[in-house]
UniProtKB/Swiss-Prot annotation:
Pfam families per UniProt: Hormone_recep (PF00104), zf-C4 (PF00105)
InterPro entries given in the database record: 1Cnucl_rcpt (IPR003074), NHR-like_dom_sf (IPR035500), Nucl_hrmn_rcpt_lig-bd (IPR000536), Nuclear_hormone_rcpt_NR1 (IPR050234), Nuclear_hrmn_rcpt (IPR001723), PPAR-alpha (IPR003076), Znf_hrmn_rcpt (IPR001628), Znf_NHR/GATA (IPR013088)
Sequence similarity: Belongs to the nuclear hormone receptor family. NR1 subfamily.
Record PTM: Ubiquitinated by E3 ubiquitin-protein ligase HUWE1; leading to proteasomal degradation. Phosphorylated.
Site, Essential for heterodimerization with RXRA: residue positions: 433
Purpose of the protein: Ligand-activated transcription factor. Key regulator of lipid metabolism. Activated by the endogenous ligand 1-palmitoyl-2-oleoyl-sn-glycerol-3-phosphocholine (16:0/18:1-GPC). Activated by oleylethanolamide, a naturally occurring lipid that regulates satiety. Receptor for peroxisome proliferators such as hypolipidemic drugs and fatty acids. Regulates the peroxisomal beta-oxidation pathway of fatty acids. Functions as a transcription activator for the ACOX1 and P450 genes. Transactivation activity requires heterodimerization with RXRA and is antagonized by NR2C2.
Cellular localization per UniProt: Nucleus
DNA-binding residue intervals: 99-173
Gene behind this protein: PPARA
GO BP terms, alphabetized: cell differentiation; circadian regulation of gene expression; fatty acid metabolic process; hormone-mediated signaling pathway; negative regulation of appetite; negative regulation of cholesterol storage; negative regulation of inflammatory response; peroxisome proliferator activated receptor signaling pathway
Naturally occurring in which organism (per UniProt): Phascolarctos cinereus
Name of the featured protein: Peroxisome proliferator-activated receptor alpha
Keywords: Activator, Biological rhythms, DNA-binding, Lipid-binding, Metal-binding, Nucleus, Receptor, Transcription, Transcription regulation, Ubl conjugation, Zinc, Zinc-finger
Zinc finger (NR C4-type): 102-122, 139-161
Coiled-coil portions: none
Length: 468
């Protein structure tokens, strides 16, 4: 999580050259092929996983990169038939309303002809062959009969008519026997139910995979934070930082490593800003490892992986930050400290403006009463966003996000059945987060220009560069 202080290795002060020189691809390579973001971003530590098994169940990918929010329906059945309910009684429906394919060539069947469902073309072909007693030149190639080539090999077409059950003794034009229709409908419903069960199982598996990756990769989550904030933790309560004196005490104990190497001699606002950056860098690394657990992410072009992280990490950070916040303050240093909201507001400008918008967002976000399983899918949807600038494989990323958003929708329906508007509310929060990150990036640029002692970490500087 984004604790204001954390126990990680100290960062030495940055020189002017670090701030002004552009971080090119060469710099990223010096960081170990973007190892600064992740020690193994090029490795698929999650193992091989075919994202295609979580196919999009919606009405089709959006062309503008927006999130698909319309009602999503099960994918079409792999069988040759699908049932479309129509008005009227079952007896009134013809075989055409069942949208059945011709058993011979796959074209749309016009009815039940000579004992099988067949199109007008194959019905006429079989009738002519029988009535005229036509004999075709033998073919040993076992030609595949399809709509586009059904007239090329008449011998194989006739053999397929016979093998699929067409018979002159079973003449019946147009109408299907009621028993046959009832049997067919039962088969269709069974197939659809089996398919839906399979799809639901796949979606649950995806949700479980993402949730487990979330719990594994982040050192702080909502359930842990709520236990600490409620005073129910088994260990000592967090140390409260509410003024300069308690801040200095915390810097000597909780975050002593972060304020070494000359940082301790700078003013309090700069020290706090430095600690915020340290925690942000750590969370970017956690988010990168989490992203690699999202099916399909590690198979993306490396440029697309970096782009998704560049534009998505701060939106994800501020969403997860809400978990450690309440109206009075926020947990820091892995839950060992609690810095008050009023103290952060008392800092001099522009530093006093950093956290207050995050508290405002957190109060509204926490009102949705999401748990970690909800948040994990929400964060995954943020990362896999197909409208980020500079993406190469937009279509694949959009399909990834559509699948995750669909899983999120179904998960919310199951996890929060009484809040029917929770899903659209959460989609709106994605837009709110973009605005929050834009304002934050603008404030950071102001600090960079006006505060000579408040140096930016190189990784965060690269993330902010040309962001918005």
């Amino acid at each position: 999580m984004v604790d204001t202080e954390s126990q990680i290795c100290p960062l030495s002060p940055f020189g002017d050259d670090d701030l002004e020189s552009p971080l090119s691809e060469e710099f990223l390579q010096e960081m170990g092929s973007i190892q600064e973001i992740s020690p193994s971003i090029g490795d698929d530590s999650s193992g091989t996983f075919a994202f295609a098994e979580y196919r999009c169940l919606g009405s089709g990918p959006g062309s503008d990169g927006s999130i698909i929010t319309d009602t999503l329906s099960p994918a079409s059945s792999p069988s040759s038939v699908s049932y479309t309910p129509i008005a009227g009684s079952a007896d009134d429906s013809s075989s055409a309303t069942l949208n059945i394919e011709c058993r011979i060539c796959g074209d749309k069947a016009s009815g039940y002809h000579y004992g099988v469902h067949a199109c007008e073309g194959c019905k006429g072909f079989f009738r002519r062959t029988i009535r005229l007693k036509l004999a075709y030149d033998k073919c040993d190639r076992s030609c595949k009969i399809q709509k586009k080539n059904r007239n090329k090999c008449q011998y194989c077409r006739f053999q397929k008519c016979l093998s699929d059950g067409m018979s002159h003794n079973a003449i019946r034009f147009g109408r299907m026997p009621r028993s046959e229709k009832a049997k067919l409908k039962a088969e269709i419903l069974t197939c659809e139910h089996d398919l839906e069960d399979s799809e639901v199982a796949d979606l649950k598996s995806l949700a479980k995979r993402i949730y487990e990756a979330y719990l594994k990769n982040f050192n702080m989550n909502k359930i842990k934070a709520r236990i600490i904030l409620a005073g129910k933790a088994s260990n000592n309560p967090p140390f409260v930082i509410h003024d300069m004196e308690t801040l200095c005490m915390a810097e000597k104990t909780l975050v002593a490593k972060l304020v070494a190497n000359g940082i301790q001699n700078k003013e309090a606002e700069v020290r706090i800003f430095h600690c915020c950056q340290c925690t942000s860098v750590e969370t970017v690394t956690e988010l990168t490892e989490f992203a690699k657990s999202i099916p399909g992410f590690s198979n993306l072009n490396l440029n697309d992986q970096v782009t998704l992280l560049k534009y998505g990490v701060y939106e994800a950070i501020f969403a997860m930050l809400s978990s450690v916040m309440n109206k009075d303050g926020m947990l820091v240093a892995y839950g060992n400290g609690f810095i008050t909201r009023e103290f952060l507001k008392s800092l001099r400008k522009p530093f006093c403006d950093i956290m207050e918008p995050k508290f405002d967002f957190a109060m509204k976000f926490n009102a949705l009463e999401l748990d970690d399983s909800d948040i994990s899918l929400f964060v995954a949807a943020i990362i896999c966003c197909g409208d980020r600038p500079g993406l190469l494989n937009v279509g694949h990323i959009e399909r990834m996000q559509e699948s995750i958003v669909h899983v999120l929708q179904l998960h919310l329906q199951n996890n929060h059945p009484d809040d029917v508007f929770l899903f659209p509310k959460l989609l709106q929060k994605m837009a709110d987060l973009r605005q929050l990150v834009t304002e934050h990036a603008q404030l950071v640029q102001v600090i960079k220009k006006t505060e000579s002692d408040a140096a930016l970490h190189p990784l965060l500087q690269e993330i902010y560069r040309d962001m918005y």
